[in-house]
Amino acid sequence: RHAANRYYTHLFLGPVSSAVMLGGRTDFFLWRPLFVDYSYNFTARNYKNGNFGNLTSVSNTESMKFLENFLSLGFGFPVTHRSAFVIRLNGGQERYYYSLDRASYKENYYEDLTTLNYISPKIELRRSSLDRMIFPHSGTSLSLSGIYLYGRDRFVPSPYSRDEQRLRKSKRDVSWWGARIVWNQYFQISGSKWFSLGYGAEAVVTTIPTLSNDKVTRMLMPAYRPTLHSQTVYMPEYRAKRYAAVSVMPTFDFSDRFFLRTGIYAMFAERFRPTDDRMRYIVDASLVYHT
């Protein structure tokens, strides 16, 4: 039995990241409530000015530009009042612009290109009782997901790479599996109206192979980006084939809507290079007001 249709358009424009999403969702009832969602997604991220927003210079970011176009089709149903199981199929193209020769560049003469055309099924079981999607103050969330990706990796070197390093165009088929678990909880400290706490854990395992070069292989690895600011820069050290991470988020409450959220995040990652550190840390503080 048909229940409802919903259509939407999302547009986000920013100096580092821009995105467009056109889609819809159909809810219906057979033996239980079911839904189908469908969307076209375009994302552009420009990390060529990779230190955007930093108050001081840093050395752990790299210049990179990323474009993605893909179609998504999902089918799911509720498991409980607050949880759902979703099967999804994504297919599209990712384009990575970067330089094999230098971490920071501005001239297109140094810009190498890797294109990945792919199709990727995904399954996910998610549960959430969070009071807000961004900067939640109470509740728990849990996500268990697994993916398979099959695609073609195509590398086009820049004029500099062709002239000085004698690199050539290349194509190859690639495939891999991956699994991720993410859990977070937020709660009020008993007996204290001024202080609350959040903590979380995340673990990822993949079988990503070596692609056309080490730089783009790392770009395609899962990233640990627990804060909003960490999502606006490209930091290779926080990408890994396999990793585990934990977080603690003390919160100082001035009112129900106004609070200071702090966070300490630690990531234990598989080494990509012998010189890589296994432990990585992020410290964050955000002054939050919810309207």
Regions found by a protein language model. Name each.
Residues 118-256, 262, 270-272:
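C-terminal outer-membrane beta-barrel translocator/porin domains of Gram-negative envelope proteins
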Residues 282, 286-291:
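Predominantly the C-terminal beta-signal and adjacent terminal strand-loop region
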